[in-house]
Amino acid sequence: MKEFWNTIQLIFAGVGGWLGYFLGGCDGLLYALIAFVVIDYITGVMCAISNHTLSSEVGFKGICRKVLIFLLVGIANILDIQVIGSGSALRTAVIFFYISNEGVSLLENAAHLGLPIPEKIKVVLEQLHDRSTKEEN
């Protein structure tokens, strides 16, 4: 039984080490992105529950999108290390983009759930929503 737990620990250590390398280490930006992604997913589920539209298919699609965010961060990190050679400009830009994107989604979810949102932020959200609707059409 002890060998089994040692194997499990070895697997988790290996996966954790690889993820740390792939994502460029666990710094404050990555922690912030993880927090925004998790909170956005939770508030999205809360919105689906309040609308009575909770679906495992939609939830799985949301998880796939969140995983893709971290894959893109990893790709940006690889480009920084292997192509550019130093720094983390691309990784940082990708993380900032997705933090802001998740933040907008989080505010939309909060507004949908009835949480009061400052008027200035509502105006910006409406402009962003109108812009994304035009791009889809």
Predicted segments with their positions:
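Membrane-proximal cytosolic segments adjacent to transmembrane helices
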Residues: 1-7, 100-137
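Alpha-helical phosphate/pyrophosphate-handling elements in metalloenzyme active cores
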Residues: 8-22
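Helix-coil boundary and interhelical linker segments in multi-pass alpha-helical membrane proteins
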Residues: 18-30, 80-90
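Loop-to-helix transition at the N-terminal end of transmembrane alpha-helices
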Residues: 28-42, 58-63
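Alpha-helical transmembrane segments of multi-pass membrane proteins
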Residues: 33-44, 69-77, 97-105
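A cytosolic-side transmembrane-helix exit/cap motif
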Residues: 49-58, 109-117
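Juxtamembrane helix-capping/reentrant segments at transmembrane boundaries
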Residues: 51-72
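Hydrophobic alpha-helical transmembrane segments and immediately flanking/interface helices
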Residues: 82-112
